[in-house]
From Swiss-Prot, chain A:
May be required for synthesis of 60S ribosomal subunits and the transport of pre-ribosomes from the nucleoplasm to the cytoplasm. Also required for initiation of DNA replication. Belongs to the CBF/MAK21 family. Its main location: nucleus. A motif (Nuclear localization signal 2) lies at residues 408-415. This is Nucleolar complex-associated protein 3. Residues 141-150, 817-830 have a biased composition (Basic residues). A motif (Nuclear localization signal 3) lies at residues 806-813. Residues 67-84, 130-140, 391-400, 420-436 have a biased composition (Basic and acidic residues). It is found in: Nucleus; Nucleus, Nucleolus; Nucleus, Nucleoplasm. GO terms for cellular component: nucleolus; nucleoplasm. Keywords: Coiled coil, DNA replication, Nucleus, Ribosome biogenesis. Component of nucleolar complexes. Interacts with RBL and NOC2 in both the nucleolus and nucleoplasm. Residues 61-81, 111-156, 400-429 form a coiled coil.
From Swiss-Prot, chain B:
The keyword Nucleus applies. Keywords: Nucleus. A motif (Nuclear localization signal 3) lies at residues 512-519. Residues 36-58 have a biased composition (Basic and acidic residues). The gene is RBL. PANTHER family: NUCLEOLAR COMPLEX 2 AND RAD4-RELATED (PTHR12687), PROTEIN REBELOTE (PTHR12687:SF8). A motif (Nuclear localization signal 1) lies at residues 8-15. Interacts with SWA2, NOC2 and NOC3 in both the nucleolus and nucleoplasm. Binds to ENAP1 and OBE1. This is Protein REBELOTE. A motif (Nuclear localization signal 2) lies at residues 35-42. Disruption phenotype: Plants lacking both CRC and RBL exhibit strong floral meristem (FM) indeterminacy with reiterations of extra floral whorls in the center of the flower associated with reduced AGAMOUS and SUPERMAN levels. It comes from Arabidopsis thaliana. Residues 1-13 have a biased composition (Basic residues).
Length: 830, 594
């Protein structure tokens, strides 16, 4: 090909001028000229076609190569070398133009050498492209394009020049377009990148797992919005991608073994996923500490923990969530608490392991902050559920522990070993009881490990929960009993003086059935000390008042104590007298509006109405105190007190002596002959020696329900037919008669009005007094008033004078009228 | 008035003679000045009316929906009164002097003539003389305020001098009623029914215009007069002959309106006189007048409560007089009271449920508080005679709600007032209303800065809310304690002779003892200590009496008669202590006023 081009190029310069000269000179040789011209055109066409094809092919190759090289440059450095090769191609385009313009042989020869090199390179590239990139359809398209371009080149040579000129402004335009991209467009571009990458991952995660790194890189952007969007997008992706099992990385031995392709793919996928997930979590934990990203990071952490509690790195998630359980930010706190409640109530996803870890972490958290957390942190425990089966072995353990008291061995290890032995014995007993059936054996074998593990986990959970509760109780006692020297060091936290005490007591009330007998004694002791905190701190200064427990808090302690005893069916012989003493005194210290009346009503119900065994002295003391209480407080409190009082009298028939005034009551009252209203001990108050005189005053209460109730109670002893059990409880009474719920309209409106007018005489007496004085004064004032009116008459006279003389005859006429009037009067008088 | 002027002008153009036209040209110069003055007065009245009407509408629409219905009724009354004003008002015909009227163009009242007429009227009951005298009376009442329209242009009345002027007014006001009754043959103690029967009496036909002219002139005098004692004297005399108004319902409504206005805006004596008139009207006339009196007074009272005044001393008088009026007919007042108290309860329930600022401010407004005060006094005055238990129950619930709406030391005055109301209701009705929890809660009002001794003057603040600065002062805490002791003393005084007094006083004494231990102020300690000692001594006193008793709590009657002899005896120790506390409280009130 090269040789042919050289010969052809040598010929055109000498031939062109003589051909033209011949045409101009000779007309007879037209035929010959036409033939010669045709041959020349044929030669030019062949030359032109090859050049055009080469140029066109070069351009296309450049465009395609540019695109692929851009992509390959990210992956391989070798492609860059090929890019260098492109530079050689550029001067090739320029050469044919110059050859046409220039006529010197030397320049053309030097360019020929370059053309040869370029041609060889182009040939090689064409081969590579055809093999890897181009398809049949693309080849056909190129062929069509080449034909079209060939037709164009048939016209004239200057067309080529024009085409070359058109290419250069396109490049400039592209350069300008790139510069015009602004920040907003880049923002949207990044958004689209995030979306595209996410879609890729969701469509085919195994193939596109590497793009996770790209998304993680976007999180490093400076724009906060983009970072947030990236974090949320990754959250959605991980939710879908993460498998339903926990990924276990292969060991060294497994790596050495030969593996099939499929296994290789899955291992690669899993390891990449874990790496990305780990880095994502690390970023979330870092962002959580920054205020800008705090809420979003916590939201991502909580959502992941809820969605995939079974997956790897769940411990890290749990630690982060528990750390924010008492966050000052309310939104974050609610998120974390609801997440942990979700974990507790849906143990099927994680098999209960997370429950143990979460409770343990919360216990450590409470310990670290010295019990100064938001109450929500511990209310979370209320969502924990324990199996009923846990109680059975515990009870067995309890019975065995009683026998162990003789041995006096209390180390934990020994207890564990002994428990294991006990379990074996229990199993043997079960085997012996059942007829040696094969099916029973199989069932026992299959379920034993799960049951054992579950019990272990739940016992650990219980121990952590109670550890937390007891720590709170101990801390409360410690803060109350502090000495004066330590006042400045201990200040109440941001959540109040004892923020965790109320949820702690509520939790204890709920989990009483799971409580061990060994701990019950301690618990009761703590509750006693807390409930009786006022007596021990009576000598403290005012500054400590904020640290004392309120009446409602102490009532809660009494409530919990009774609930604990109730749930254990009074198995223990614990002395509850102290709690009755506290209730007896707290009734006097109750303050509506500051203390919760609902708790008072509940404590009255549980401690007095539902109590089975009561001492007569104690019952009488409470009856008397409740009656006194009803005299001083509002409708709701009075009604609940009267309901309780009625219940007590119905249960204790002997206490009804309080309704009668017997002179010889000394025998029943016992040792104490007089009632002591200010006594602190109900057994020593001597209530049986007195009478319920409060009822006669309560029967005059303005509220009809209370007066009716008081009358009913006072008549209880005489009319025994009315002794039906009342369906109303103190709690319902308190709720029904509170101001907010109760209607202000009286039910029975009686309009029997008797008019008695007794005050008619009083105001009449006041009538006569001012008259005498007024007559004199009024006369005087009227004279003054008339003087003022005389002034007005003078003004009138002046007006009349000012007008004109015409008034004068009118005046004369008036005088005449006056004179005439006088005359008939004198006649009449005669 | 403008309309009448136009009509008068048209009438004058058509009917006057040439000579009289000249005299008219002279007169307008004088009348124009007075006309301007009248216009100014009217404009002032209109402005006042506009100002008054707006807040009334707001109050009625916002809070008392049912009372808005009464407002419509009130509007009808206004229309009726306006129609009454448009009636022609002219001089009476003098039959005897018809011949003279053509000749005489202007009549001037002289002393001698007046003396003659007075003698004829007083001694002989000569009707023509009475006619002349009433015409002169009318001229005197409207002296300086003549209306522009004159029905009889040929007659012009003028008064000679000041003494004659005074004599005319005093004589007519004093003697008119007696003269009317003597002519008709009625006694002074005649009732409304007899007066209504007068229509059958032939003498009434000739005398009716005279009576009407008298009342119309007197009402005009009451309206226009600016002097205190003139109005007072006029009202006093008007009461005597109020029965005759039965024949003139339009004038009666007008009188009610004027009296209500004077009752609310007048000074003490005028207000009392106006109230006495309203009371007589409600007693003598039928139930419709009673309703209109009650409604008008109620609206005026509430409207007055909205206006903040420096001197609120007159408000108790208004309240007491309104209660007295309501007590005349408890049956009808009961209906009004139940509607109003139901509205109060609804507002309170809204405030308790929502705790909105707007709802709470309505509760704490002067209008709401004074309305409660009104009904508390009404129920207290009538609860023993009539069966007002439903009203009592509802109002007690309302007061408890107001006291518990917002718990805080800034609302000390409101809480003290609520407890006063409850004590008052309990004392008058004999029903037990517990106040101990409300009172003892005030002991918990802790002040920060106990050491400061800022002696700020506790002026009588009529507002419900106290400023924050006062909470830190020592005087505030002293006032808290004194109020607690005073209120408990009143509560215990009522039940100091009841058989259950020892039990009633147990919890308050216990709380006061703890307070006594905690407080550091010696003055307060001394006062509290003495109170505790007195109560405990009374406890022992009742306890000893109680031990000798033989009946049981079942026996309610014997429990009520317990210690009746001691109750009547004023030498009981607690009663004396209670009197001393009350005297101290009154003394402090006097000091505050000074």
């Amino acid at each position: 090909m090269g040789k042919n081009r050289r010969k052809q190029k040598v010929i055109p310069p000498p031939l062109l001028p003589p051909d033209v000269a011949e045409e101009d000179i000779e007309f007879s040789d037209e035929d010959l000229k036409y033939v010669k011209e045709n041959t020349d055109y044929a030669q030019f066409v062949s030359q032109i076609d090859t050049a055009a094809i080469n140029k066109q092919c070069g351009g296309r190759v450049m465009t395609v190569e540019d695109k692929y090289e851009e992509e390959r440059s990210k992956r391989k450095t070798l492609q860059e070398e090929k890019g260098n090769g492109e530079i050689l191609v550029d001067p090739v385009d320029v050469l044919p133009v110059k050859t046409l313009d220039g006529k010197l042989h030397y320049r053309t020869e030097s360019k020929k050498s370059k053309l040869a090199e370029a041609e060889t390179d182009e040939a090689e590239k064409d081969v590579l492209e055809d093999e890897h990139v181009l398809n049949k359809s693309q080849r056909r398209e190129k062929a069509k394009k080449s034909k079209r371009e060939a037709k164009k080149h048939e016209k004239d040579l200057p067309d080529e020049i024009l085409q070359e000129e058109e290419e250069t402004p396109q490049a400039a335009v592209l350069a300008e377009v790139k510069e015009e991209l602004s920040a907003e467009e880049s923002f949207e571009n990044k958004k689209n990148k995030i979306a595209e990458l996410g879609m890729l991952l969701l469509s085919d995660p195994e193939a596109n797992i590497k793009t996770l790194k790209d998304m993680l890189d976007i999180c490093k952007d400076q724009n906060t919005k983009i970072v947030k969007l990236a974090l949320l997008s990754l959250l959605a992706v991980f939710k879908d991608i993460i498998p339903g099992y926990r990924i276990r990385l292969p060991t060294e031995k497994e790596l050495e073994m030969k593996i099939s392709k499929e296994v290789k793919k899955t291992r690669f996928y899993e390891s990449t996923l874990l790496k990305a997930y780990k880095s994502y979590l690390q970023k979330l934990i870092i962002f959580e500490k920054q205020s800008v990203y705090n809420q979003i990071a916590n939201r991502c952490l909580c959502t992941l923990l809820e969605a995939v509690p079974h997956f790897n790195y769940r411990d890290n998630l749990l630690i982060a969530v528990v750390r924010n359980i008492s966050s000052p930010d309310e939104v974050v706190r609610r998120l974390c608490c609801s997440t942990i409640r979700y974990l507790f109530s849906n143990e099927g996803k994680h098999g209960g392991e997370l429950t143990v870890q979460a409770v343990r972490l919360i216990a450590d958290h409470v310990k670290a902050h010295n019990c100064q957390l938001h109450p929500n942190a511990i209310e979370v425990f209320m969502s924990i559920r324990f199996d009923e089966d846990i109680g059975k072995p515990n009870k067995e353990d309890e019975h065995n522990k009683k026998y162990k008291k003789n041995n006096k061995r209390k180390t934990q290890e020994e207890q564990n070993q002994v428990q294991e032995n006990e379990r074996k014995k229990s199993k043997k007993d079960m085997m012996s009881k059942i007829r040696d059936e094969v099916s029973a054996d199989h069932r026992g074998v299959t379920y034993e490990p799960d049951a054992k593990e579950r019990r272990k986990m739940q016992t650990e959970t219980l121990s952590a929960v109670f550890e937390t509760y007891f720590r709170i109780l101990r801390n409360t006692m410690y803060t109350i009993g502090e000495r004066t020297e330590e006042i400045p060091t201990s200040n109440p936290g941001a959540f109040g003086s004892h923020p965790l005490l109320a949820p702690c007591l509520d939790g204890l009330a709920k989990f009483t059935q799971q409580l061990d007998l060994d701990y019950m004694g301690d618990l009761m002791n703590y509750l006693k000390k807390l409930a009786s905190s006022s007596s021990s701190v009576s000598n403290n200064t005012k500054q400590k008042n904020s640290k004392l427990l309120t009446v409602s808090e102490r009532l809660r302690c009494c409530l919990v104590a009774f609930k604990v005893m109730r749930s254990n069916l009074n198995a223990l012989n614990v002395d509850l007298q102290d709690f009755f003493v506290q209730l007896y005194n707290l009734i006097l210290e109750y303050r509506p509006g500051r203390d919760s009346g609902v708790i008072l009503a509940e404590s009255l119900k549980i401690m007095l109405c539902d109590d089975r065994h009561q001492d007569m002295q104690k019952a009488a003391a409470f009856v008397k105190r409740l009656a006194t209480f009803a005299l001083c407080f509002g409708c709701a409190e009075s009604m609940s007190a009267l309901v309780t009082l009625k219940t007590l009298l119905q249960k204790n028939v002997k206490c009804r002596n309080l309704l009668e005034n017997d002179a010889g009551g000394g025998s029943v009252s016992g040792s104490i002959a007089k009632y002591q209203p200010y006594a602190t001990d109900p057994n020593l108050s001597g209530a049986l020696a007195t009478v319920l005189w409060e009822l006669s005053l309560l029967s005059k209460h303005y509220h009809p329900a209370i007066s009716t109730m008081a009358t009913t109670v006072s008549n209880m002893n005489t009319s025994q037919s009315q002794t039906f059990l009342s369906a109303v409880t103190p709690q319902q009474a308190f709720a029904d008669f509170s101001l907010v719920k109760e209607s202000f309209e009286p039910k029975n409106e009686s309009r029997k009005l008797n008019n008695k007018r007794k005050r008619e005489s009083l105001p009449e007496e006041a009538k006569n007094v001012p008259e005498i004085d007024m007559v004199k004064l009024s006369k005087k004032l009227k004279e003054n008033f008339t003087i003022l009116r005389d002034i007005k008459e003078d003004e009138r006279v002046r007006m009349e004078l000012l007008q004109s003389e015409e008034k004068k005859p009118l005046k004369k006429q008036n005088n005449v009228v006056k004179k005439k009037l006088k005359n008939p009067k004198s006649k009449k008088q005669i | 008035m403008g309309k009448l002027g136009k009509k008068a002008r048209k009438f004058a153009k058509k009917n006057l003679q040439s000579v009289e036209k000249r005299s008219r040209k002279l007169k307008p110069f004088i009348k124009k000045k007075f006309a301007k003055r009248n216009e100014r007065h009217q404009a002032g009245d209109k402005q006042e009316k506009k100002v008054e009407q707006q807040p009334k509408k707001r109050c009625q629409e916002e809070e008392f929906q049912d009372i808005a219905i009464d407002a419509v009724f009130g509007k009808d009354d206004d229309e009726v009164l306006r129609d009454g004003d448009s009636d022609s008002d002219g001089y009476l015909d003098e039959l005897v002097n018809e011949t003279d009227s053509d000749i005489m163009k202007c009549k001037v009242l002289s002393r001698s003539f007046l003396a003659t007429c007075c003698d004829m009227v007083d001694k002989e009951q000569y009707v023509p003389a009475l006619v002349r005298l009433l015409n002169w009376y009318r001229a005197a009442c409207q002296y300086g305020h003549e209306p522009s329209g004159i029905a009889r242009p040929n007659i012009y009345y003028d008064i000679e001098d000041s003494e004659t002027f005074a004599k005319v007014i005093i004589f007519v006001l004093q003697k008119a009623d007696h003269t009317f009754r003597s002519i008709l043959g009625l006694s002074d103690s005649s009732t409304k029914e007899k007066i209504l029967k007068l229509k059958n009496n032939p003498k009434w036909d000739s005398l009716k215009p005279l009576v009407k002219s008298f009342f119309r002139s007197t009402l005009h005098l009451v309206k226009q007069a600016g002097d205190l004692e003139i109005i007072s004297f006029t009202l006093t005399q008007l009461r005597v002959s109020i029965v005759f108004l039965a024949a003139f319902p339009d004038l009666l409504k007008k009188l009610i309106k004027i009296s209500v206005h004077l009752w609310v805006t007048g000074e003490e004596t005028i207000s009392q006189q106006a109230f006495l008139i309203l009371k007589d009207i409600s007693m003598v006339f039928n139930s419709e007048c009673f309703d209109s009196c009650l409604i008008n007074m109620y609206k005026a009272f509430l409207h007055d409560c909205d206006i903040p005044k420096a001197n609120s001393e007159q408000r108790p008088f208004l309240r007491d007089s309104l209660v007295e009026l309501c007590s005349q007919d408890v049956q009808k007042s009961y209906t009004k009271a139940s509607v109003s108290i139901t509205q109060l309860a609804k507002l309170l329930k809204m405030a308790l449920a929502t705790k909105n600022k707007e709802a709470v401010e309505k509760i704490h407004s002067g209008e709401y508080i004074n309305c409660v005060d009104l009904w508390v006094n009404f129920i207290s005055a009538n609860v023993q005679d009539c069966d007002l238990q439903p009203l009592l129950y509802t109002i007690v619930q309302v007061i408890n709600g107001v006291a518990q709406l917002i718990i805080g030391p800034r609302y000390l005055l409101l809480r003290v007032k609520c407890i006063h109301w409850l004590n008052h209701l309990s004392r008058t009705s004999g029903i037990f209303i517990p106040i101990a929890s409300l009172v003892l809660d005030m002991l918990e009002y802790k002040t920060t800065n106990d050491g400061e001794k800022q002696e700020q003057k506790l002026e009588a603040v009529s507002t419900v809310k106290l400023p924050k600065n006062w909470l830190k002062s020592q005087n505030f805490q002293e006032q808290c304690i004194f109020s607690v002791i005073e209120l408990l003393a009143v509560h215990f005084a009522q039940w100091s002779f009841h058989i259950s007094f020892p039990d009633l006083a147990t919890i308050p004494v216990m709380r006061l003892k703890k307070f006594h231990e905690r407080s550091t102020m010696e003055g307060l300690k001394r006062v509290v200590k003495r109170f505790i000692e007195q109560v405990e001594s009374n406890i022992e006193f009742v306890q000893r009496k109680r031990d000798d008793v033989t009946f049981s709590p079942n026996d309610q009657q014997s429990a009520d008669t317990f210690m009746q002899l001691e109750k009547q005896n004023a030498n009981a120790p607690y009663t004396q202590y209670y009197q001393s506390i009350i005297d101290k409280a009154l003394g402090t009130n006097k000091k505050k006023k000074k």
